[in-house]
A protein has these predicted regions:
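His/Glu-rich zincin catalytic helix
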Residues: 1-55, 70, 80, 151-172
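Acidic/histidine-enriched segments that form metal/cofactor-coordinating
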Residues: 49-153
């Protein structure tokens, strides 16, 4: 969609795929999404972040798709980086460990939140533990997820053949 009012471009990527069943390994969605968008097999996380920051661009990816925003003059390069990160993510053990530690810290913080406890209890009672809405990750389930699990999860659910991309902004 062309819109030349401002010199910027936005891209949204959405995947049309079957629902994700996390009941076997709760936390896969979260950990895989946390590892996406931070570089690729060809561009280190540090170089990726430095380049997108230098251009003032935003690149955000999850297992569901993602989005990116940039000034028009940087759009071709930002789109290259977005595609590179989406199609060739670099899942490393160090990044998996960081994401896992972050999730566990969040779980521990939620232990004292009445709102979080009520939400989990209500969902579990309403849907049951075999339903995706009634299943939650735990410290144990997070610790059981391996780098191979994350890679296989990505390969199963992130497919360009099922992707829709919308580009809006100062483009021809």
């Amino acid at each position: 969609v062309e819109d030349h009012k401002l010199p910027r471009v936005s891209v949204s990527l959405t995947l049309d795929r079957p629902p994700i069943d996390e009941t076997q390994k709760p936390g896969m969605y979260y950990l895989t999404s946390e590892l996406m968008g931070g570089g690729s097999k060809n561009i280190s996380k540090e170089a990726f972040v430095e380049e997108t920051d230098r251009m003032g661009a935003t690149v955000y990816l999850t297992i569901d798709g993602g989005n990116t925003y940039s000034l028009t003059r940087y759009f071709p390069r930002v789109l290259e980086l977005f595609a590179e990160a989406a199609l060739h993510p670099n899942f490393t053990q160090a990044e998996l460990d960081k994401a896992r530690d972050k999730a566990i810290a969040s779980l521990k913080a939620e232990e004292n939140s009445a709102q979080s406890i009520i939400y989990r209890l209500n969902s579990a009672l309403t849907y049951g533990k075999k339903h995706p809405y009634g299943s939650f990750y735990t410290e144990e389930s997070l610790k059981s997820i391996t780098l191979s699990d994350v890679s296989n999860f990505y390969k199963t659910y992130f497919s360009p053949a099922n992707a829709y991309m919308v580009v809006v902004g100062d483009v021809n």
